[in-house]
């Protein structure tokens, strides 16, 4: 399938989730947790949100907003001292 803005956001988000320890495909080996790299992807998506403001369809906006929310919540949970 062709790459769309939404699929691009989902791909980046999935990478960030995997870097935070999520195993998206049970048939694949998990990768080591790397919170700084996961945060870098979150920051990249945040810049993308700022730079595309007013130029996205409502569906694209929703995908980006929801992905950023999920990633930020997961990151805060993992990065908080226990």
Q: Where in this protein do the model-derived segments appear?
A:
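Long, contiguous alpha-helical segments
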Residues: 1-82
